[in-house]
Amino acid sequence: MRVGVDLIEIARIRRALERYPRFRERCFTEAERAYCDSRPNPAESYAGRFAGKEAVGKALGIGVARAFAWKDIEIVGRPKPSVHLSGRVRELAEKTNAGAIDLSMSHSRELANAVAVVGD
């Protein structure tokens, strides 16, 4: 079993959404954008999903240091999020025989966090 954890300030994601219009398209799939944009506070949802992507990357051992496309990790579903891998991330997961991925996300007023557990 491998675990990845991430914590991010919601204000940081809110600023990225406001300052960099391409941030949404570069980091989130169409389904993720539709979900987040439908929420009362989209920045909280985007921050949770961003933290989720980071946590999954860390649990898979690819973290921030190895290049991958953010959209290669897609987080969908509610209330229990599910993770769909594609592209390079999927290839790396298959090479390492990664099992099922469980993900938990949460947020407070200021922070979003995620914990990913990858089975062996």
Walk through the language-model features, giving the residues of each.
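Core catalytic alpha/beta fold that binds nucleotide/phospho-ligands
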Residues: 1-120
